C-alpha cells in the first residue's frame, strides 16, 4: 500500500526525522491559511498523488512569494497530472502539500528496500540526489552505493561509516547521520514497509539533515497489525476495479490490454500474461482468483474484468490441483448464464477431472464459449478473438 508524501512526513516526524514545516491543502482557502502560518518567502507546493515524476510533469512548484504560491496552488488543485508512473489518463490532483523552502548545500538520494535475491534489506544511497535514481543508475552508476543489511543483525555503525566515506560528508556528522538511518530503519522494520525513499535528503547550511521528499510503501499482507497505516489508504489513487477486487479478496491489477485473464495461482497468471504477449496480444489485467476458483469466484472475476470496456475476450486458465476442474466448469457455466458477458470466453482447463470439465463446457451450448486443453493454443485463440481475426 502506498501513501502520500504528507502522510510519510508525519511518520518521519514521529520517529525524529527532520522535515520542513508544512501542511496539506484541498482548496485555496486552506492553502492561504497554511501560507500565513509558514515563515520565509520561499515555498514548495507539491501535488499529492501516488506516482513519481511529479516535478518533470509540472506537479512541483517553487514560489518566491505568498502571492505566487496562491497562483501555483490554483493551477495545481484540480489538474490532471500525467507522469511515467501514472495511468495514461493521469491522476486528478485533489490535494497539495505546501512547505517552507530550505537552503541546503548537498542533496542525497537514500532508500531502504527489500532485495529478494539476497533476502536482505538494501540501503541505497546516491551522491546525485533530487533526480531520478533510474536515470542515475543508467548514466552515472558510480554515484550509487548499495549496502546489504542482514535483518537478523540490523543496521550497524559501520554501515553509517561506509556511507560517510562514500558521500564524502564531514565525519563530525557521523552521529547525526547514524541517528537518521537508525530512525528510518525502525520505521521500515516496525511498520512492515516495502520501501522508504527520501529523494532528496538534504544537508542544510547549519549541518542538519532534512527529508525534503518522502515516499513510503507498505506490505499489504501485514496491514492487519498496523491499523494506523491502513487508515492512511487513499482509494482515489487506485483504480475502482482494484478497490472492488480487494473487497472481494481477489488479486487484481488493471493493465492496458484487451485480453481479460482469469487464472488461479500467481505464477500461472504471470506465465499466461507472458504467452499472450508473445503471441502478439496484451493482457487487460492480472487476476489470480486463488482459492476463490469457484462458481461464485469466477462470476465475480468476470464482472470485475467486464468493468473495463477495452476487454474484447476473457481467457480463463485454470490448473486443477486441489480444485477439481469439473467444479470450475460448473462455475463457469453458471457465471456465463448469470452474467451477460458480451465478449467471447476461452477456457483452458488442465488437471483433476479436466476431461469431464471440458466435456461439460462443450455440451453447455453456450454462445461464444470456446475450450482448449492446451495453454498455448488457448492463448492463441484468445489473442485472435481479441483482434477480431476469428
From Swiss-Prot:
Binds 1 Mg(2+) ion per subunit. Residues 9-244 form the ATP-grasp domain. It catalyses: succinate + ATP + CoA = succinyl-CoA + ADP + phosphate; GTP + succinate + CoA = succinyl-CoA + GDP + phosphate. Its EC number is 6.2.1.5. Its cofactor is Mg(2+). Mg(2+) binds at residues 199, 213. Pfam families: ATP-grasp_2, Ligase_CoA. Pathway: Carbohydrate metabolism; tricarboxylic acid cycle; succinate from succinyl-CoA (ligase route): step 1/1. InterPro entries: ATP-grasp_succ-CoA_synth-type (IPR013650), ATP_grasp_subdomain_1 (IPR013815), Succ-CoA_synthase_bsu_CS (IPR017866), SUCC_ACL_C (IPR005811), Succ_CoA_ligase-like_bsu (IPR005809), Succinyl-CoA_synth-like (IPR016102). It is an enzyme of class 6 (ligase). Signal peptide: none annotated. GO terms for biological process: succinyl-CoA metabolic process; tricarboxylic acid cycle. It comes from the Bacteria. One of its GO terms (cellular component) is succinate-CoA ligase complex. ATP binds at residues 46, 53-55, 99, 102, 107. Succinyl-CoA synthetase functions in the citric acid cycle (TCA), coupling the hydrolysis of succinyl-CoA to the synthesis of either ATP or GTP and thus represents the only step of substrate-level phosphorylation in the TCA. The beta subunit provides nucleotide specificity of the enzyme and binds the substrate succinate, while the binding sites for coenzyme A and phosphate are found in the alpha subunit. Belongs to the succinate/malate CoA ligase beta subunit family. Heterotetramer of two alpha and two beta subunits. This is Succinate--CoA ligase [ADP-forming] subunit beta. It comes from Campylobacter curvus (strain 525.92). The lineage of its organism: Bacteria, Pseudomonadati, Campylobacterota, Epsilonproteobacteria, Campylobacterales. The gene is sucC.
Amino acid at each position: 500500500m502506498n501513501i502520500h508524501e504528507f502522510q510519510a512526513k508525519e511518520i518521519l516526524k514521529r520517529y525524529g526525522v527532520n522535515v520542513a514545516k508544512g501542511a496539506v491543502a484541498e482548496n485555496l482557502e486552506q492553502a492561504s491559511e497554511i501560507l500565513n502560518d509558514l515563515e520565509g518567502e520561499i515555498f514548495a507546493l507539491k501535488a499529492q498523488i501516488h506516482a513519481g515524476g511529479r516535478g518533470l510533469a509540472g506537479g512541483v512548484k517553487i514560489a518566491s512569494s505568498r502571492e505566487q504560491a496562491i497562483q501555483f496552488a490554483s493551477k495545481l488543485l484540480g489538474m490532471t497530472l500525467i507522469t511515467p508512473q501514472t495511468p495514461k489518463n493521469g491522476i486528478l490532483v485533489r490535494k497539495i502539500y505546501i512547505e517552507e523552502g530550505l537552503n541546503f548545500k548537498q542533496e542525497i538520494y537514500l532508500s531502504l528496500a527489500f532485495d529478494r535475491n539476497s533476502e536482505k534489506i538494501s540501503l541505497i544511497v546516491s551522491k546525485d540526489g533530487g533526480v531520478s535514481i533510474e536515470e542515475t543508475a543508467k548514466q552515472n552508476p558510480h554515484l550509487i552505493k548499495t549496502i546489504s543489511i542482514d535483518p537478523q543483525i540490523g543496521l550497524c555503525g559501520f554501515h553509517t561509516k561506509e556511507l560517510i566515506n562514500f558521500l564524502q560528508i564531514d565525519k563530525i556528522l557521523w552521529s547525526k547521520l547514524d541517528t537518521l538511518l537508525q530512525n528510518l530503519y525502525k520505521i521500515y522494520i516496525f511498520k512492515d514497509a516495502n520501501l522508504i525513499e527520501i529523494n532528496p535528503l538534504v544537508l542544510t547550511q547549519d549541518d542538519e539533515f532534512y527529508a525534503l521528499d518522502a515516499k513510503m510503501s507498505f506490505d499489504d499482507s501485514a496491514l492487519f497489525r498496523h491499523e494506523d497505516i491502513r487508515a492512511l489508504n487513499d482509494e482515489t489513487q487506485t483504480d475502482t476495479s482494484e478497490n472492488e477486487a480487494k473487497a472481494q479478496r481477489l488479486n487484481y491489477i488493471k493493465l492496458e490490454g484487451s485480453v481479460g485473464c482469469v487464472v488461479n495461482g500467481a505464477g500461472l497468471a504471470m506465465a499466461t500474461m507472458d504467452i499472450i504477449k508473445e503471441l502478439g496480444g496484451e493482457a487487460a489485467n492480472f487476476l489470480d482468483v486463488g482459492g476463490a476458483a469457484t462458481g461464485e469466484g469466477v462470476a465475480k472475476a468476470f464482472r470485475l474484468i467486464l468493468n473495463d470496456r477495452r476487454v474484447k475476450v476473457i481467457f480463463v486458465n485454470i490448473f486443477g490441483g486441489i480444485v477439481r476442474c469439473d467444479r470450475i466448469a460448473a462455475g463457469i457455466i453458471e457465471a456465463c448464464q448469470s452474467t451477460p458477458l458480451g465478449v467471447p470466453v476461452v477456457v483452458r482447463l488442465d488437471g483433476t477431472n479436466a476431461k469431464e470439465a471440458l466435456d461439460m463446457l462443450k455440451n453447455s451450448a453456450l454462445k461464444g464459449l470456446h475450450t482448449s486443453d492446451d495453454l498455448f493454443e488457448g492463448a492463441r485463440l484468445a489473442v485472435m478473438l481479441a483482434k477480431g481475426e476469428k
